[in-house]
């Protein structure tokens, strides 16, 4: 079966995503606190390297969630910044060795080779797929060495949902943060050691009681686009070719108490059924 195209906003500007990835066969590979601590650390380091801003995250026993912000511009990442990010990801020594390597290449007239290497690094920035690839490579090395594990850690590709800003972003952030409460692991989200939520940029527009977010909402966790109908339609139009061969099903998210839509790729006969 052909893989479904990942929904990602292209071009310059700001976009937000909800990302979720599970352990292989839903096994409790991350059950120990030390493993979850390392998972969170790898998320932070991979995000800093990739230029991704974390809005919320939670590490659970067999999966994790992230809400993140991606800002894309025409301004290339400067060499000093590239080295700073490499230091975050791989350590100061690795960054120092890379800087020395680039200097040596420049001294023998191989500036083009330096530009090519830096270009490959820049291509890994500000992209959720590259962010997840960097994170999983980093975490996998530690996990397999620490746990003497030889099997597959992750269950296929990660799931991602493109989300609108403002209240939709805030809803996803709170939904992610409440995961340990929904799972019965703690009574208050703030008591869970492996989750975090950023303070909102501005007051939350349109209150959503937390008890509503205690219900699992498929459009947040499994949809492809989450936001107002205007946002969803505009994104579907902008993404164009990815949707022409498929139908798009709109489902109203009534549990959240205000008008919003979660859209996902669906079969034609499913799309004809209307809101669920």
Describe each model-derived feature in a short phrase.
Residues 1-61, 69-276:
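Short Pro-Cys-Gly-centered "Cys-loop" motif that presents a nucleophilic cysteine in a tight turn
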């Amino acid at each position: 079966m052909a893989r479904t195209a990942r929904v990602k906003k292209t071009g310059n500007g700001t976009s937000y995503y909800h990302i979720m990835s599970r352990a292989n066969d839903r096994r409790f590979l991350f059950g120990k606190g030390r493993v979850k601590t390392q998972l969170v650390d790898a998320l932070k380091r991979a995000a800093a390297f990739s230029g991704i801003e974390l809005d919320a995250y939670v590490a659970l026993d067999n999966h994790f969630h992230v809400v993140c912000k991606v800002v894309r511009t025409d301004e290339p990442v400067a060499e000093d910044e590239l080295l700073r990010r490499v230091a975050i990801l791989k350590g100061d020594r690795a960054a120092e060795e890379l800087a020395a390597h680039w200097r040596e290449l420049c001294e023998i007239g191989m500036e083009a080779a330096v530009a090519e290497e830096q270009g490959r690094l820049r291509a890994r920035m500000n992209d959720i797929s590259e962010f997840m690839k960097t994170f999983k490579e980093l975490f996998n090395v530690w996990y397999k060495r620490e746990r003497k594990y030889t099997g597959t850690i992750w269950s296929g590709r990660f799931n991602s949902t493109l989300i609108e800003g403002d209240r939709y972003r805030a809803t996803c952030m709170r939904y992610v943060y409440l995961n340990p409460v929904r799972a019965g692991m703690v009574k208050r989200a703030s008591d869970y050691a492996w989750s975090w939520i950023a303070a909102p940029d501005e007051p939350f527009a349109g209150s959503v009681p937390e008890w509503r977010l205690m219900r699992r909402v498929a459009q947040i966790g499994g949809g492809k686009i989450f936001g107002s109908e205007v946002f969803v339609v505009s994104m579907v139009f902008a993404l164009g070719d990815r949707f022409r061969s498929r139908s798009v099903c709109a489902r109203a998210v009534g549990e959240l108490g205000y008008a919003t839509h979660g859209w996902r790729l669906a079969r034609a006969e499913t799309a004809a059924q209307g809101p669920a």
